[in-house]
């Protein structure tokens, strides 16, 4: 595992297609955030999971970002297509692979399928 802290950002305002605006806590993004926090706790993982009000990728809900100091940041979407509990496990799997890299670039063949299909952007490390 990486000694550098990894952060997962989850867009909690993301809505699945046809989903109501209110209540906000029932939106797909909020459900994924809760499922990810729960799955990380159940797995004994000490991960920083941050709820973000909007990541401006509304056409590909739910959007998630993985980042760590000195590493590439990845933005993934399309997690509203699967149950939040399944998406959370996929994200934790991808996160473990991300943490094992020096630069944040998970080799293509090692990425969970949802991280291959769902990649939106890769941003270079800062600094």
Where are these regions (language model features)?
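Immediate flanking context of iron-sulfur cluster ligation sites
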Residues: 2-9, 33-57
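Glycine- and acidic-residue-enriched helix-capping/strand-helix junction motifs
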Residues: 20-29
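Local cysteine-cluster metal-coordination motifs and their immediate loop/turn environment
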Residues: 7-21, 51-68
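Ferredoxin-type iron-sulfur electron-transfer modules in oxidoreductases and energy-metabolism complexes
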Residues: 30-47, 68, 79-89
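Short flanking/linker segments adjacent to small metal-binding domains or redox-active Cys/His motifs
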Residues: 59-60, 65-71, 92-127
């Amino acid at each position: 595992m990486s000694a550098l802290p990894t952060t997962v950002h989850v867009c909690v305002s993301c809505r699945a297609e046809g989903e109501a605006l209110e209540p906000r806590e029932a939106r797909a993004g909020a459900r994924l955030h809760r499922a990810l926090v729960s799955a990380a706790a159940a797995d004994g993982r000490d991960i920083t999971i941050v709820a973000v009000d909007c990541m401006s990728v509304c056409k590909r809900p739910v959007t998630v970002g993985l980042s760590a100091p000195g590493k590439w940041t990845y933005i993934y979407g399309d997690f509203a297509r699967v149950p939040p509990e399944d998406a959370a496990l996929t994200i934790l799997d991808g996160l473990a692979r991300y943490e094992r890299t020096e630069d944040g670039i998970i080799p293509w063949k090692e990425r969970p399928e949802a991280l291959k299909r769902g990649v939106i952007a890769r941003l270079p490390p800062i600094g």
